[in-house]
C-alpha cells in the first residue's frame, strides 16, 4: 500500500498539520515540529501533543506515515566544534519532539563540509552525530535525505548515504529518504522507466531498499546533473511524470511516506489524486 501526501503547514500548532493533510485526502504527510529557521522553540504543550495524537488516530495516520523534517540550520557534519555541538543539541531536541508526538521518523539533510574538512571526515562526523542523538532518544529513526549537492552539501551520492549508515551503530534506527529532484540534479536519471530501473538498482546495490523510509516526490526546475536544488510541480519540470508513475506501481516503495514538496500547494489535491490513480 502506498502512503501519499505533502509537506503541510503546522501554523497554529502541529495538531493543525494533521487536519490539513486530511483535507488534501493525503494518506501521509510531512511537517516541521518547530520553526525551521530558528534554533530555539517553545516546548510542545501537553494539550497540543494530545490533540496531535487524537487527530492522527481520527484520520488514520500511523507513526510511520508521518515524515517530519528538522531545522534547516542544523549541520551534523559541521567542521567547527562549537557550531557542531549547537547542531547536535538541536537535532536531539528535534528527535525528542518526535518522541513526544509518537512519530517514528525524522528526516534531515546530512550536512556540509564548508570547504574546511575533507568529505570522508565530514561523513564520519555526521554518523557520530547520529549515534549521539540515537543514544539520547528511543524508537525514532534518523532518516538521511539525499541532496542535490548544492554548495558543499554532502549526501548527493548514494555512496555518501552508505558511508553514513556504515558509521551508525544502531542500524535499526537509521534510514534514508530519496528526493527525486535532488537525485536528478545530482546526476541520477529518472526520465524513463529504463533509467529509473538502473538508478534504483544502483540504490539497492550501494545502500539497500531495507533502509528506504520515505521519499520526496518532486519534479525539477534544475537541469540534469546540475547540482542545483529547484523543485517543480509534477510533470512541469525536467524530469516529467514517468518516474512518479513508476514509483507508484513498484512494490519496493510500499508502506513508506511519499511526500510532495512541489511548488504549488493549490494543486496538491490533484497531484495526490493523480499519484493514487497510477497504482491501477
Swiss-Prot record:
<feature type="binding site">
    <location>
        <position position="182"/>
    </location>
    <ligand>
        <name>Zn(2+) 3</name>
    </ligand>
</feature>
<keyword id="KW-0234">DNA repair</keyword>
<feature type="binding site">
    <location>
        <position position="109"/>
    </location>
    <ligand>
        <name>Zn(2+) 1</name>
    </ligand>
</feature>
<feature type="binding site">
    <location>
        <position position="261"/>
    </location>
    <ligand>
        <name>Zn(2+) 2</name>
    </ligand>
</feature>
<keyword id="KW-0479">Metal-binding</keyword>
<dbReference type="Pfam" id="PF01261">
    <property type="entry name" value="AP_endonuc_2"/>
</dbReference>
<dbReference type="GO" id="GO:0008270">
    <property type="term" value="F:zinc ion binding"/>
</dbReference>
<keyword id="KW-0227">DNA damage</keyword>
<protein>
    <recommendedName>
        <fullName>Probable endonuclease 4</fullName>
        <ecNumber>3.1.21.2</ecNumber>
    </recommendedName>
</protein>
<feature type="binding site">
    <location>
        <position position="69"/>
    </location>
    <ligand>
        <name>Zn(2+) 1</name>
    </ligand>
</feature>
<dbReference type="InterPro" id="IPR036237">
    <property type="entry name" value="Xyl_isomerase-like_sf"/>
</dbReference>
<feature type="binding site">
    <location>
        <position position="145"/>
    </location>
    <ligand>
        <name>Zn(2+) 1</name>
    </ligand>
</feature>
<dbReference type="GO" id="GO:0008081">
    <property type="term" value="F:phosphoric diester hydrolase activity"/>
</dbReference>
<feature type="binding site">
    <location>
        <position position="145"/>
    </location>
    <ligand>
        <name>Zn(2+) 2</name>
    </ligand>
</feature>
<comment type="similarity">
    <text>Belongs to the AP endonuclease 2 family.</text>
</comment>
<keyword id="KW-0378">Hydrolase</keyword>
<feature type="binding site">
    <location>
        <position position="231"/>
    </location>
    <ligand>
        <name>Zn(2+) 3</name>
    </ligand>
</feature>
<feature type="binding site">
    <location>
        <position position="216"/>
    </location>
    <ligand>
        <name>Zn(2+) 2</name>
    </ligand>
</feature>
<feature type="binding site">
    <location>
        <position position="229"/>
    </location>
    <ligand>
        <name>Zn(2+) 3</name>
    </ligand>
</feature>
<dbReference type="GO" id="GO:0003906">
    <property type="term" value="F:DNA-(apurinic or apyrimidinic site) endonuclease activity"/>
</dbReference>
<dbReference type="GO" id="GO:0003677">
    <property type="term" value="F:DNA binding"/>
</dbReference>
<dbReference type="GO" id="GO:0008833">
    <property type="term" value="F:deoxyribonuclease IV (phage-T4-induced) activity"/>
</dbReference>
<keyword id="KW-0540">Nuclease</keyword>
<comment type="function">
    <text>Endonuclease IV plays a role in DNA repair. It cleaves phosphodiester bonds at apurinic or apyrimidinic (AP) sites, generating a 3'-hydroxyl group and a 5'-terminal sugar phosphate.</text>
</comment>
<dbReference type="InterPro" id="IPR001719">
    <property type="entry name" value="AP_endonuc_2"/>
</dbReference>
<dbReference type="GO" id="GO:0006284">
    <property type="term" value="P:base-excision repair"/>
</dbReference>
<feature type="binding site">
    <location>
        <position position="179"/>
    </location>
    <ligand>
        <name>Zn(2+) 2</name>
    </ligand>
</feature>
<keyword id="KW-0255">Endonuclease</keyword>
<dbReference type="InterPro" id="IPR018246">
    <property type="entry name" value="AP_endonuc_F2_Zn_BS"/>
</dbReference>
<dbReference type="InterPro" id="IPR013022">
    <property type="entry name" value="Xyl_isomerase-like_TIM-brl"/>
</dbReference>
<keyword id="KW-0862">Zinc</keyword>
Amino acid at each position: 500500500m502506498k502512503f501519499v501526501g505533502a509537506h503541510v503547514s503546522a501554523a497554529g500548532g502541529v495538531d493543525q498539520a494533521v487536519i490539513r493533510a486530511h483535507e488534501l485526502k493525503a494518506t501521509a504527510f510531512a511537517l516541521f515540529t518547530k520553526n525551521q529557521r530558528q534554533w530555539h522553540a517553545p516546548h510542545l504543550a501537553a494539550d497540543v501533543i494530545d490533540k496531535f495524537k487524537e487527530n492522527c488516530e481520527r484520520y488514520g495516520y500511523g507513526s510511520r506515515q508521518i515524515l517530519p523534517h528538522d531545522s534547516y540550520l542544523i549541520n551534523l557534519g559541521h567542521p567547527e566544534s562549537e557550531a557542531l555541538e549547537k547542531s547536535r543539541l538541536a537535532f536531539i531536541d528535534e528527535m525528542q519532539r518526535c518522541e513526544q508526538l509518537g512519530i517514528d521518523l525524522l528526516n534531515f539533510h546530512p550536512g556540509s563540509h564548508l570547504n574546511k574538512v575533507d568529505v570522508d571526515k565530514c561523513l564520519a562526523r555526521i554518523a557520530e552525530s547520529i549515534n549521539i542523538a540515537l543514544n539520547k532518544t528511543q524508537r525514532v529513526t534518523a532518516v538521511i535525505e539525499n541532496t542535490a549537492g548544492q554548495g558543499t552539501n554532502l549526501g548527493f551520492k548514494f555512496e555518501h548515504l552508505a558511508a553514513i549508515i556504515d558509521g551508525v551503530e544502531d542500524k535499526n534506527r537509521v534510514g534514508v529518504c530519496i528526493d527525486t529532484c535532488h537525485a536528478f540534479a545530482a546526476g541520477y536519471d529518472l526520465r524513463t522507466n529504463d533509467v529509473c530501473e538502473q538508478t534504483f538498482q544502483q540504490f539497492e546495490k550501494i545502500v539497500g531498499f531495507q533502509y528506504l523510509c520515505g521519499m520526496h516526490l518532486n519534479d525539477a526546475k534544475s537541469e540534469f546533473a546540475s547540482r542545483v536544488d529547484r523543485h517543480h510541480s509534477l510533470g512541469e519540470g525536467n524530469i516529467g511524470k514517468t518516474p512518479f508513475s513508476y514509483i507508484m506501481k513498484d512494490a519496493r516503495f510500499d508502506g513508506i511516506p511519499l511526500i510532495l514538496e512541489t511548488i504549488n500547494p493549490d494543486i496538491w489535491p490533484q497531484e495526490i489524486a493523480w499519484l493514487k490513480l497510477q497504482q491501477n
